[in-house]
Amino acid sequence: PEQAVQQASTEPDSQQAAAEAQAAVTEEKRKAYEQATAALDAYLKAQSQKYQDPARHCSLDFTCPLPSVGRISTYFGEPDAVYNKPHTGADMPAASGTLIYAVADGVVSAASARPSYGNCVQIDHGTADDGSSYATLYAHMSSFCVSAGQTVHKGDVIGYVGNTGDVRGANGGYHLHLELRINGTRTDPLQYIPH
């Protein structure tokens, strides 16, 4: 009986230790995620500046980036299940290899593999009549078929749906992660882009 009491009293301690260890791992992952995000943002900003042309006009006449979108699995701003950070784009589930289209005319400012976004493409669409610059980012592609500096037109195929990079949780399957940046700031893409 005394041994059973002693064993029962140590169970909460071991549960607390396990919870603390899990919290430490989660915090470490969160910090790594934030560092990777900062590095990605710096890279994308530098690439955008490299290919930015103030004379390029963005008409804001966007098209859907996929042949069809059945649903949105994660919306812009929803808390991330792992890091509890706001989601930076909209996730559109689709079959592996589904064509991904440029939503508008522009110049590819980045086409590379990144740790968090996997194979991704950023397109700078230019400046709209309101003076704001627009860019879109397409992530987790299985592969892309454009290169930095390439001019693309609305509806051109730029890559294929995949699940590369840091995909997890409910969004761990094949999907397009789509971001819209206005003057470099992430904005809800579904406010501008048909789906």
Residue spans for each PLM region:
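Short edge beta-strand segments in beta-sheet-rich domains
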Residues: 87, 118, 133, 171-175
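Alpha-helical oligomerization segments with coiled-coil/rod-like character
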Residues: 1-59
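OB-fold (S1/OB) nucleic-acid-binding surfaces
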Residues: 123-133
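Active-site-proximal beta-strand/loop segments in catalytic clefts of secreted hydrolases
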Residues: 75-77, 103-104, 111-112, 124-126, ...
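Surface-exposed, glycine-biased beta-strand/turn segments
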Residues: 38-119, 128, 154
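Short histidine-centered loop motifs in beta-beta connectors
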Residues: 95, 111, 132-155, 183, ...
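Histidine-centered divalent metal-coordination motifs
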Residues: 87-89, 140, 175-179
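Conserved, short, structured surface segments that act as functional micro-motifs
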Residues: 121-122, 150-195
